[in-house]
C-alpha cells in the first residue's frame, strides 16, 4: 500500500483519483503531479513502482503544503483574522458566512440548526 504525506492511498484506484485522498490535492493538482512525474493517469496505485512513488513524493515536497501543514496554515489564517478584529474574523467568530452571502434566509449549514425563540414556545403552550 502506497503512503504519501501520511495518507494511505487506496490500491485499487487509478493514480489520478488516489492522489485526491490527500488533503489539498484535487483532480487538477493530481493530474499536474502525475504529468510532472511522467506517470500514466490510468495506472493503478498498486501498480506504481517505489521509484514512481518517490518521484511524486519529491514533487509534493517542492510544491507546497498538503495534509497537516495545510490544515494548520488555514487555521492559523483564520485565527489571525479573528485576532486582528477584521470583518472576516468577526464573521468567523460568530459562525456566519464569511464571503458576503445572505443570512436572512439560508446559511443553515454555517449557522447550525434553528433555535426557536422563547416567545414562540410560550404562545404554542398557551393555546392548548
Swiss-Prot record:
One annotated Gene Ontology cellular component of this protein: small ribosomal subunit
Gene3D superfamilies, sorted: 1.10.8.50, 30s ribosomal protein s13, domain 2
InterPro entries: Rbsml_uS13_C, Ribosomal_uS13, Ribosomal_uS13-like_H2TH, Ribosomal_uS13_bac-type, Ribosomal_uS13_CS
Bias kind Basic residues: ranges: 89-128
rRNA-binding in keyword set: yes
PROSITE patterns per UniProt: RIBOSOMAL_S13_1, RIBOSOMAL_S13_2
Domain of life: Bacteria
Region ranges (Disordered): 85-128
GO biological process: translation
GO molecular function, one term: structural constituent of ribosome
Record's keyword terms, sorted: Ribonucleoprotein, Ribosomal protein, RNA-binding, rRNA-binding, tRNA-binding
Record's subunit section: Part of the 30S ribosomal subunit. Forms a loose heterodimer with protein S19. Forms two bridges to the 50S subunit in the 70S ribosome.
Physiological role: Located at the top of the head of the 30S subunit, it contacts several helices of the 16S rRNA. In the 70S ribosome it contacts the 23S rRNA (bridge B1a) and protein L5 of the 50S subunit (bridge B1b), connecting the 2 subunits; these bridges are implicated in subunit movement. Contacts the tRNAs in the A and P-sites.
Family affiliation: Belongs to the universal ribosomal protein uS13 family.
Xref: PANTHER family: 30S RIBOSOMAL PROTEIN S13/40S RIBOSOMAL PROTEIN S18, SMALL RIBOSOMAL SUBUNIT PROTEIN US13M
Listed name of the protein: Small ribosomal subunit protein uS13
Annotated organism of origin: Solibacter usitatus (strain Ellin6076)
Gene: rpsM
Amino acid at each position: 500500500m502506497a503512503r504519501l504525506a501520511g495518507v494511505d492511498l487506496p490500491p485499487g484506484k487509478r493514480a489520478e483519483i488516489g492522489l485526491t485522498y490527500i488533503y489539498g490535492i484535487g483532480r487538477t493538482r493530481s493530474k499536474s503531479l502525475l504529468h510532472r512525474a511522467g506517470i500514466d493517469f490510468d495506472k493503478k496505485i498498486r501498480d506504481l513502482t517505489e521509484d514512481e512513488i518517490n518521484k511524486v513524493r519529491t514533487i509534493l515536497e517542492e510544491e507546497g503544503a498538503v495534509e497537516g501543514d495545510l490544515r494548520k496554515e488555514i487555521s492559523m489564517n483564520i485565527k489571525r483574522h479573528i485576532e486582528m478584529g477584521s470583518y472576516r474574523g468577526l464573521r468567523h467568530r460568530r459562525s456566519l458566512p464569511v464571503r458576503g452571502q445572505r443570512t436572512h434566509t439560508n446559511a443553515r449549514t454555517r449557522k447550525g440548526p434553528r433555535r426557536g425563540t422563547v416567545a414562540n414556545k410560550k404562545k404554542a403552550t398557551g393555546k392548548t
